[in-house]
């Protein structure tokens, strides 16, 4: 019997692109950085989140849920935290180059309200990794890695600051795979600091309702909505409270340090800690739908064509219009990937001349 239950989120371009893994060389350990939110909270969040992020399995003290099939890509470990002198992203695990998302399984550990790992969460996560290592023929000592090991992101933060805890975790997984009995895992204490925090930061936020909108800038306009959060999900960092028109919003940051704005009404959100209030929202400048307003998540190299790949206006090679071409061997920035229609390989969503376009999945290779 499996340690985790399968409850897959719908295929979508943001959190479950429907692309097939190229293999499983490692299993990657993460933490949610979202105190008090359990596995099902995160399943519901990633069901309709409009951010390019996800993981395969979420684990809390009561259950483990697999939200993306283990033969599909999840967006969990290809972020850019550092670059070398040549401008190349730091990639610390050679076996997962150039893009860990296509070669690994991502597992997220949920946090208690105080920011700690419950001992039952740790123990259940061990059992999840036992099952994964057996399934994919992996050695837990060499093939379980932290998100930190791949990109230098501070994740899972408690086991970056105390790496011995991570070593102990892998040893316990190894022992369980060998049929040895192990003592109950001890809880991990909350971390005392976060690299993304500043002196102005003293709170965290959770939504009281499903489908609560958040914005790219201080605004109430539909065009500035970048996603929604469900009940129990929110942001680990509240920077300040700002006035937007006649009402207030919180300036918040997600676990990656990206800034957003969300209503400050206590009807819709709960905030822990004290948060300073700014007299007015920062000034913003309007943007057009140019390349600067489309976020790049990486690049692909054009492969598998005789001379050039066709760029389409929508992800359906049977009914789309051709808007251009990209030559064989050239590179192009992507904003994600989608399943689309009439192609089992899906489509790369590319940034072509400042606009979104689509290239058949088989004609692009991540770099």
Swiss-Prot record:
Subcellular location as annotated: Secreted
DNA repair keyword on record: no
For the biological process aspect of GO, one term held by this record is:
peptidoglycan catabolic process
SMART domains registered for this protein in UniProt: Ami_2 (SM00644)
Q: Where is this chain compositionally biased, Low complexity type?
A: 180-204
Molecular function as annotated in GO: N-acetylmuramoyl-L-alanine amidase activity
Specify the N-acetylmuramoyl-L-alanine amidase domain's residue ranges: 24-158
Q: Which residues form a coiled coil?
A: none
Write down the top EC class of this protein. hydrolase
| Reactions that this protein is recorded to catalyse | Hydrolyzes the link between N-acetylmuramoyl residues and L-amino acid residues in certain cell-wall glycopeptides
Q: Matching InterPro entries, A to Z?
A: Amidase/PGRP_sf, Amidase_domain, NAMLAA_amidase_2, SH3-like_bac-type
Spell out the disulfide connections.
none
Q: What keywords are assigned to this protein? A: Cell wall biogenesis/degradation, Competence, Hydrolase, Secreted, Sporulation
- Region: Disordered; residue ranges are 178-204
This protein's superkingdom?
A: Bacteria
Q: Does the keyword Secreted apply?
A: yes
Matching PROSITE patterns = SH3B (PS51781)
Limits of the SH3b domain: 202-271, 298-367
The EC designation for this entry is 3.5.1.28
* Any one Gene Ontology cellular component term annotated for this protein: extracellular region
Q: Which Pfam families match?
A: Amidase_2 (PF01510)
Q: What is this protein for, i.e. what is its function? A: Autolysins are involved in some important biological processes such as cell separation, cell-wall turnover, competence for genetic transformation, formation of the flagella and sporulation. Involved in prophage SP-beta-mediated cell lysis.
Q: What is this protein called?
A: N-acetylmuramoyl-L-alanine amidase BlyA
Question: Which organism does this sequence originate in?
Answer: Bacillus subtilis (strain 168)
